[in-house]
Amino acid sequence: WVTDITYIATDEGWLYLAGIKDLFNGELVGYALDTRMTQQLVMQALFRAVAAKRPGKGLLHHSDRGSQYCSQAYQKLLRQFGMQVSMSRKGNCWDNAPMESCWGSLKTELVHHRRFASREQAKREITEYIEIFYNRIRKQARLGHLSPAAFSQHYYAMQMAA
């Protein structure tokens, strides 16, 4: 998994979005939105990802070196979930390119075409983008031009047939 935080402008001020992407199928497996960029924000995204996917021990979790990800509480949580910690080299955004690409898609396809009057409006539209469009409909070249949901369905059908 890779993770990062981005921010979205609203008429009420910034809204922060922490997301976790599964590199296997390109799905955003967990995310959280809040008015502040805190360790609680990234922990909420992690709890949601773990609750949704129940990963096995040893899953590789990659982030940048932001204070939220380096916090003792977050690192402890990763250990409790049995995850292997990987962090970007200092000042090297290329290490987390898949997550940066995800944020670029979100902003190009949704955020830059909207003016959010409120944080609640932004939360609703971002949630719909992730849950309906990004994970279920949006095709990714890396996945053979399938959506994350279709790729997973195809993969597991092939596993059952083998």
List the predicted regions and their residue ranges.
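Charged DNA-binding/catalytic regions of mobile-element recombinases
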Residues: 1-162
